[in-house]
Amino acid sequence: MREICYTNRKKSGRNDTPFDSNQGEIRRMLARRELPTEFIEWNKRWGAPSGYPPRIGQRFWGRLLSNSARTKLAGPFSIQKNSPTRRYEYPWAFYAIPLAPGMRVVDVGGGLAGFQFVLSQAGAIVTNVDPGLCAKGRGWKCDLESVHYLNRLFGTTVELRSCTLSEASLQNNAYDVVYSISVMEHVTDGEFWETANHVWDCLKIGGRFVITVDLYLNLLPFTSRKSNEYGVNFPVGELINFKTFSLVTGDVREIYGTTAFDKERILTNLEDYSLGEYPVLAQCLVLEKQ
């Protein structure tokens, strides 16, 4: 049976209508329970999503190490607690765009998560834009001192701008990639579109917006409930038609906010998706600035 998929093409009215294709790899939009081999290997290499496991006997000899040595041993993903779905999201985001040394990238709401440091180690010039505890929604501690410390520890050069994207004064048409890993569902509706506007502004023509957004199974459109303690289900599929953004590839039936979104298909195939302790799925998509 053929999948319904979406691949990048010129716009003609609304561009979220699915069509059949037998050509090329189909990129699914919702994080899957079963990881591709390269994702498993990536997580093992970088200690994602929660840091490297303790080494043999570390419970005893680890107490002799300094805090810095223990942190370095645990790796960049040990700093900030992550959802289980990140085991899919982080390698997916890394492989979504082939990185080359010198590429300028932005990590929106990167906090102290390890992904920004992996991007830097891969040769990218990384700017993390995060207001930390000053965020209006769900914030976390993220300050210049901590980022400088982690840069020294991991041999990276991440730049932190402790503010929102609207206050970051990013150069227009200057960045190759903007990453947003599970951030947009935690902001207000106004902030969502304000952020999308600034992402579009700072990207080069042909630049990519790599985004993952939580899809809560206990909220609209699956139930009548509008919000939970973590956020809301934003119709992220509407980004496909925002300004000159275009969806690169994927199955639009799995993206909330597209006309093809199929909640029944999702609910009847829950065993295929990556689920943590909380009833949430991860939507993964790549947009290109045309």
Predicted segments, located by residue:
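Class I (Rossmann-like) S-adenosyl-L-methionine-dependent methyltransferase catalytic domain
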Residues: 3-96, 105-106, 112-167, 210-290
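Phosphate-coordination loops involved in phosphoryl transfer and adenosine-cofactor binding
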Residues: 101-102
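A short acidic, Gly/Pro-enriched loop at the edge of an enzyme's catalytic core
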Residues: 166-178
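A short glycine-rich, Lys/Arg-flanked "PGG" loop and its adjoining helix->strand segment in the class I
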Residues: 193-205
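A short secondary-structure junction signal
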Residues: 190-192, 222-223
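Alpha-helical membrane segments in multi-pass integral membrane proteins
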Residues: 177-178, 199-200, 209-211
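A short SAM/SAH-binding and catalytic strip from SAM-dependent methyltransferases
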Residues: 177-190
